[in-house]
Swiss-Prot record:
InterPro entries on file: BASP1
Compositionally biased region (Low complexity): 45-66, 88-98, 145-155
Protein name: Brain acid soluble protein 1 homolog
Residues linked to a lipid group, N-myristoyl glycine type: 2
Membrane-topology descriptor: Lipid-anchor
Residue stretches of biased makeup (Basic and acidic residues): 15-26, 35-44, 72-87, 99-113, 134-144, 156-166
Source taxon at top rank: Eukaryota
Gene behind the chain: basp1
Source species: Danio rerio (Zebrafish)
Keywords: Cell membrane, Lipoprotein, Membrane, Myristate
Keyword Lipoprotein found: yes
Subcellular location(s) of the protein: Cell membrane
Pfam annotation, one family: BASP1
Keyword Lipoprotein: yes
Length: 197
């Protein structure tokens, strides 16, 4: 953690970012670490403590998703046993720093993506899987009556928004309708062929 590079000592303009990056790489530290203020590292440590519960569950759900996050090396050395939890917490800290509700929503969204979710997240994962199962039934009804399909879709959207899984239910209900319409024209073609023969 050296001090700022002086203009006279290095022989280049202070605003020259490429030259700074080269010097930082030759010294053995990346440009991001050398320019990062100490306050950001302290904020990341505080965010790690506050999001430990959600980060632990999220890390179990996605073991390698946060490997690209730039965590301070000092934190990794001091907290070696919970090292698996830190990248997830730092990724949440590096993401737009908002309320804990957003981090919990992100943690809820991750188990839906990953197949191996922890037992704690199994309840949350079963709830989103129950919603698509319920939406398949209205999709079947949609083939019969278009009006109930609109009502079923409007009922399922608030549930989907609260679970942050709005896109998959929409995709499931949309293909169900074209499949039924595609199967109905096929017999019509066969009937037309049968009539022509």
């Amino acid at each position: 953690m050296g001090g700022k590079l002086s203009k006279k000592k290095k022989g280049y303009n202070v605003n020259d970012e490429k030259a700074k990056e080269k010097d930082a790489k030759t010294e053995g530290a990346s440009a991001e670490e050398s320019e990062a203020p100490k306050e950001n590292k302290e904020d990341a440590a505080a965010a790690t403590e506050t999001t430990n519960d959600t980060a632990a569950a999220a890390k179990e759900a996605t073991p390698t998703a946060d490997s690209n996050s730039t965590a301070p090396k000092e934190e990794e050395k001091s907290a070696a046993p919970p090292k698996k939890e830190e990248p997830a917490a730092n990724a949440n800290a590096n993401a737009p720093k908002a309320s804990d509700a957003k981090t919990s929503e992100a943690a809820k969204a991750e188990p839906a993506k990953s197949p191996d979710a922890p037992p704690v997240k199994a309840e949350e994962k079963s709830a989103p899987s129950a919603a698509p199962a319920n939406e398949k039934e209205p999709a079947k009804e949609a083939a019969k009556d278009p009006a109930p399909a609109v009502a079923a879709a409007s009922e399922s959207k608030p549930d989907a928004e609260s679970k942050k899984t709005e896109a998959p239910p929409t995709k499931e209900s949309a293909p169900a309708e074209p499949i039924t319409t595609e199967t109905s024209p096929a017999p019509n073609k066969e009937q037309a062929v049968a009539v022509q023969d």
